[in-house]
């Protein structure tokens, strides 16, 4: 007689093992997830505790524009030593109070990121983009806020005139106070990583840019509001406008009233309406292979127009910008000049508009006023379009500047230059009727402004020479401050602006002259980035 076993058979044992394995497979991620969620929530509570600690300190730090704390490796570097924080090991980020005492923050460790903006709190593992993303927006700009390329760094300046990383969520510009938005592009391998508030080493900067917001303008009489004459003009009436708004008025008052506003031409790029443009703060510097935009060094000259056009591209390409850098057009020069001749530039009151000072440096040193001055000195800022360090420099004197503005031939094609030896380097008709064919093709139409000779004229009439009508932004201001105004004609089909130091009183914001487009030791150029 056999006794029946009460143990598991091999098959049953294997089945149990399989079931347990399945349970483990299912349960382990759940348990791991619970543990991770607990750690994540613990990090969030610790971050909230750090923020809470700043509330015992903010009363002593608050300014009219708010205040921002910096959290670095678990320590708030600008926190009163009597205020203690805990559970903050390895945390970094920023805590920002606005002027009303409302707090936003972005705090991260090696694994988690918590961001609070308004009433919204997000918790993620995206630590590479753990920043407060609500940038400062000046209401007067009507939505035309600075658009930064991901490789650009917003800056302000110390009292000593040294650029430092701006807190984009605080007031880092104010057009109402004639403080224009500035940004820099760093070299590809800077000496360090820069954080908010850090002063930036000049050797780490490849280029400086200034934001020109989209606007429309109109003019009272022939000399602006409160203007008396060309030698003592008044201010241009402008207002900042949304990208969706476009005005095509005659840019002139009606019976003393501000009407007929016109959107400045620079804010149209092909079919695209622009919210603004970034303009090189100084004339282009460096070399043809490695162009820069920097103060205190000689400007890049002795290039024809086509070479300058190609060189301008390299500022963006060499420094890995996603937005394109390009050579400035005539309309873009005008955009800077008109903004400067407004209440947001060099006209701080209804009765005073000061002329941009001449850069009379005979060595073409950028950012100078009188020889020997630097752009960030008391004397140097007189050559700025804002009378302070935030403006654009070298627009009166220094070197003259080629712009992308060209006379069309009778077939509607851009001319090349004077003769086969002296020309822009672009293909096109020459003054003697022959053609240059071994040069570069001109870029798309949106990259240059064009002029035409109408009727029996032998040179461009600025009242009829732009699309059959007025050359807005140029013709209204001819001769202001006694700046030189010279003709564009078949022998001199390319436009240059600003004048060079040797033009003396004839140089200035409103100086314009046709010339041959060739390489010249007295002529530089300027780069722009067209904001999205």
Model-derived segments and spans:
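N-terminal single-pass transmembrane signal-anchor helix
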Residues: 4-32
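Short aromatic-cysteine micro-motif
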Residues: 199-206, 240-395, 531
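Acidic glycine-/aspartate-rich tracts in secreted/extracellular proteins
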Residues: 112, 215-218, 282-285, 405-407, ...
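Alpha-helix exit/C-cap motif
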Residues: 52-71, 342-347, 374, 405-408
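C-terminal, surface-exposed recognition/capping segments
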Residues: 331-334, 352, 360-373, 377-379, ...
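Periplasmic/extracellular, small/polar-rich flexible segments of pilin-like filament-forming proteins
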Residues: 56-135
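N-terminal module-boundary/linker segments of secreted carbohydrate-active enzymes
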Residues: 132-259
